[in-house]
UniProtKB/Swiss-Prot annotation:
Binding site for ATP: N45, Y468, R564, H592
Protein name: Polyphosphate kinase
Gene: ppk
Keywords in alphabetical order: ATP-binding, Kinase, Magnesium, Metal-binding, Nucleotide-binding, Phosphoprotein, Transferase
Post-translational modifications: An intermediate of this reaction is the autophosphorylated ppk in which a phosphate is covalently linked to a histidine residue through a N-P bond.
UniProt lineage: Bacteria, Pseudomonadati, Pseudomonadota, Betaproteobacteria, Neisseriales
Length: 685
């Protein structure tokens, strides 16, 4: 195999992940309304794919057209491959929505009504709705020398309206643009009595098509064509020109809405001359045009399951388990002082993490609280608890990562509120995203200071903690808590990195540790000792780690990798990676935990980490890897995080040498193993 073929294309691998997500929308074992949600997730993922990865490829093609990255292809070649794969995925997605999901939903009396199928009473209600809810809000923009083509917001819904006639001022007009504000719903529910007692929805685009003429009185509407522009959403801040990072990011957030276009979506009924006109306005080519058979934004269909009261068509609710030791009246610090606590979300409640900060805020023995925030959502109980602690005159330090992609606005808002409450807010280290998930509480106990720390694989986000699978460790281990304190001092202050006792950190020691542990397993295999690596992560694309894994495989190390998303390593290639197996698990929960286990001659060195095996995590972010050494906790991490995932034959996909995936299935006589359901049964309490 040539050097160029040893590494797969990361963008194609990311699209392959979205094909696995789309398979959930096809799976008849998944409740029907949840299948619709998975369809929407794919659309949301594709939006981000174009905003970030395709935008990066376009910039790379412009700046370095001859450069060949790890996969050996020039940017233009990769763009062509990725465009073809994206078109195939999008066609499949719309075919699934139009020809499978809509008919199945209709059989459950959940209808998406097209204009041609509206009844008389539905037409009357829709017209009244337009007059009452839409007409006062919409502002048409006629195109003439005094009204140039407007700049549509990123991913906004717009309409190109063809007109015939003259307006009140005698101006002839051939074209106007109507922008649909984001506050408007993209699907409008009809009253049940108009839908035979079931649920009915109409698309905003259909309502506008039917009544757009009311925006142009006295003129003839010849055509109305929806379009949606996706823009480059990279957010860049020049370190040398920035005096106030928060203010600079606020400015960049506005500018991001108007980045360069990377994709134009139109309905497949849009005439060629309108397509060409729009492409010219946005300086795009036919290669960046996507014609879809249906509404140009399927993401907003995610509102439908919440509007339909059909529990039988949704996942049954789960209640996270709570550790028996964590009684309602048991102070968490008393428990952690006795032994560390391992939490596995969402199967076990995130509440102990919130309780830790809440108790710290109210505890007179607590002197200081420190915490990182990467993503925490708009409705956080943790941030108000930190504010309460600051208002109680405790020393509160919060490292807020303002550059967390697509959460920048939330984080700017929280940072402002924390500062107003008296917290010491730090925006990390310029040039390095603070992706580590860590919190530290310092108490005075019996006249001495005692530290308590939480370290996790996932964000301090109560919303995603109910969906994402993650591990968290709450510990009073003196060496680990001292390390966490050192990391906070590094981030908030200046000076050289401190020496850590147990933790590994990016960008200094984590990559070396991973490479070193792989090399040690390689040497063990060469010496005839048992050698094994098992790891779970979201993405694996860092080339030096991949090459180290190839060397380990060649030496006989048995390697099992559970990689949910991107993986550019080729498994199962004779002479290269025949001892490497890669699987991806896609189910109801989003697999998000990062767990590494190196056999080490039977010692099973085990870590939970905030870092995937990507270049950005190793070299451009501040990350942590925490060793799990307590025997019972290590046993749990290995079993729940790795062994049960390797046994899954229900939601697992097995990666092939060419980068494709096939679905795992029980062998003849083998019982079904479902990682996520089995973990709910094990941990819900």
């Amino acid at each position: 195999m040539t050097e160029q073929n040893r590494i797969l294309c990361r963008e194609l691998s990311l699209l392959a992940f979205n094909r696995r997500v789309l398979a959930q929308a096809e799976d008849k074992n998944v409740p029907l309304l949840e299948r619709l949600r998975f369809l929407c997730i794919v659309s949301s993922n594709l939006d981000e794919f174009f905003e970030v990865r395709m935008a990066w490829l376009k910039r790379e093609n412009k700046l370095h057209p001859r450069r060949r990255p790890d996969n050996g292809k020039m940017p233009s070649e990769t763009i062509a491959d990725v465009t073809e794969a994206a078109r195939s995925l999008i066609r499949h997605q719309y075919d699934l929505f139009n020809n499978v999901l809509q008919p199945e939903l209709a059989r459950e009396s959940i209808h998406f009504y097209r204009r041609r199928n509206w009844t008389g009473t539905q037409k009357k209600w829709i017209e009244d709705y337009f007059d009452r809810e839409l007409l006062p809000i919409l502002t048409p923009i006629g195109l003439d020398p005094s009204h140039p083509f407007p700049r549509p917001l990123n991913k906004s819904l717009n309409f190109a309206v063809e007109l015939d006639g003259t307006d009140a001022f005698g101006r002839p007009s051939g074209m106007a643009i109507v922008q649909a504000p984001r506050i408007l719903p993209r699907v409008v529910p009809l009253p049940s009595e108009l839908c035979g007692g079931g649920h009915g929805f109409v698309f905003l685009s259909s309502i506008l098509h039917a009544h757009v003429g009311k925006l142009f009185p006295g003129m003839n509407v010849k055509g109305c064509h929806q379009f949606r522009l996706t823009r480059d959403s990279d957010l860049t801040v020049d370190e040398e020109d920035v005096q106030n990072l928060r203010a600079a990011i606020q400015n960049e957030l506005h500018d991001r809405e108007y980045g360069d276009g990377v994709r134009l979506e139109v309905a497949d009924t849009c005439p060629a001359y309108i397509r060409d006109f729009l492409l010219a306005q946005f300086r795009l080519t036919d290669a960046e045009l996507y014609q879809v058979k249906g509404p140009v934004n399927l993401v907003r269909l995610n509102a439908v399951p919440d509007l339909v009261n059909r529990p039988d068509l949704k996942f049954p609710p789960h209640t996270p388990g709570r550790l028996k030791a964590l009684g309602k009246n048991s102070p968490i610090f008393d428990l952690v002082r006795q032994s560390p606590i391992l939490l596995h979300h969402p199967y076990q409640s995130f509440d102990p993490v919130v309780d830790m900060i809440r108790e710290a805020a109210a505890d007179p023995a607590v002197l200081a609280v420190k915490m990182t925030i990467y993503r925490t959502g708009t409705r956080s109980e943790l941030v108000p608890a930190l504010m309460k602690a600051a208002l109680a005159d405790k020393q509160v330090t919060v490292v807020v990562e303002l550059m967390a992609r697509f959460d920048e606005a939330n984080n700017v808002n929280w940072a402002k509120q924390l500062e107003e409450a008296g917290a010491h807010v730090v925006y990390g280290v310029f040039g390095y995203k603070v992706h580590a998930k860590m919190a530290l509480v310092i108490r005075r106990e019996d006249g001495v200071l005692k530290r308590y720390a939480h370290l996790g694989t996932g964000n301090y986000h109560q919303g995603t903690s109910r969906i994402y699978t993650d591990f968290g460790l709450i510990t009073a281990d003196e060496q680990i808590t001292a390390d966490v304190n050192t990391l906070f001092m590094e981030i908030t202050g200046l000076g050289k990195p401190g020496r850590l006792n147990k933790l590994y950190q990016s960008p200094f020691t984590l990559h070396k540790m991973v490479i070193g542990r792989i090399a040690r397993e390689t040497e063990h295999a060469k010496a005839g000792k048992p050698a094994r690596i098992t790891a779970k992560m979201n993405s694996l694309i860092e080339p030096t780690v991949i090459e180290a894994l190839y060397r380990a495989s060649a030496a006989g190390v048995q390697i099992d990798l559970i990689v949910r998303g991107m993986c550019t390593l080729r498994p199962g290639v004779k002479g290269l990676s025949e001892n490497i197996r890669v699987r991806s698990i896609v189910g109801r929960q989003l697999e998000h935990a990062r767990v590494y286990c190196f056999h080490n001659n039977g010692a099973d060195d085990t870590f939970i980490s905030s870092a995937d095996w990507m270049g950005r995590n190793f070299f451009r972010r501040i990350e942590t890897a925490t060793p799990i050494t307590a025997p019972e906790l290590k046993k749990r991490v290995i079993r729940e995080g790795l062994e049960m995932a390797l046994a899954d034959n229900t939601h697992a996909w097995l990666m092939q040498p060419d980068g494709g995936y096939i679905r795992a299935a029980p062998a003849e006589g083998e019982s079904e193993a479902d990682l996520q359901n089995d973990l709910w049964d094990l941990l819900r309490g």
